[in-house]
A protein has these predicted regions:
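Conserved catalytic-core motifs of GNAT/GCN5-like acyltransferases
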Residues: 144-147, 163-179
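Conserved GNAT acetyl-CoA-binding A-motif
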Residues: 136-146
Length: 197
């Protein structure tokens, strides 16, 4: 499939999403694989192509909105395409964008069923690209993310320099028990310093 590139990296490209991507990839099926959604709020009920198309139409910023660099009130979500195989392997998102306080939340997911790429390189590069775009192109000053897994929280702190700002005790219901949720924050100046290390 020919993807419409938005941000170009060494190992991955971040691409614009539309109905064609949903119809011509296995994206919507990711949410039916329990390992992909184990620590997410989605995936508790079967997912269909129709639900994915509705999601694109109703929840995501359009290509035109993203390319205009104007304020958007919907989620900015980009596909992660592994360059060697030209395969859609993940998604990055920026949401709850506050243009007054200059903050937002980010998330990333990769399809754990796909094994023919270096997941760590892809995971690192796509998040780096998103952070750079949000801080240096959209001029945001602080970015938040979250995790319901302490190991993932610690990994995010180590790899990107986020700081743990809050712990919501027994917040998320996962595998039959309530787990803590960790809220992490990263200031633009801390990201600039962290990248130089």
């Amino acid at each position: 499939m020919k993807f419409e590139e938005f941000l170009i990296g060494k190992y991955v490209n971040l691409v614009l999403l539309d109905e064609e991507v949903a119809k011509n990839t296995d994206w919507y099926t990711w949410f039916n694989f329990s390992e992909n959604t184990k620590i997410l709020d989605v995936g508790k009920f079967p997912h269909t192509l129709k639900k994915q198309l509705d999601y694109i139409k109703n929840e995501l910023a359009t290509k035109k909105e993203i390319l205009s660099f104007e304020e958007v009130d919907r989620k900015i979500q980009l596909g992660v395409v592994e360059k060697v195989t030209n395969t859609l392997v993940g998604m990055v998102s920026a949401y709850n964008i506050n243009y007054i306080s200059r903050t937002c939340y980010v998330s990333v997911i990769t399809d754990l069923r796909k094994k023919n790429f270096n997941r760590l390189k892809v995971f690192k590069e796509c998040q780096d690209m998103l952070l750079d775009h949000l801080f240096f192109t959209l001029n945001l000053r602080k970015i938040y993310t979250g995790a319901t897994d302490k190991k993932l929280s610690d990994f995010t702190i180590k790899i990107w320099g986020f700081k743990r700002e809050a712990i919501f005790e027994k917040h998320a219901y996962i595998d039959g028990k309530y787990e803590d949720a960790f809220v992490l924050g990263l200031f633009k100046e801390d990201w600039q310093r962290f990248k130089k290390i």
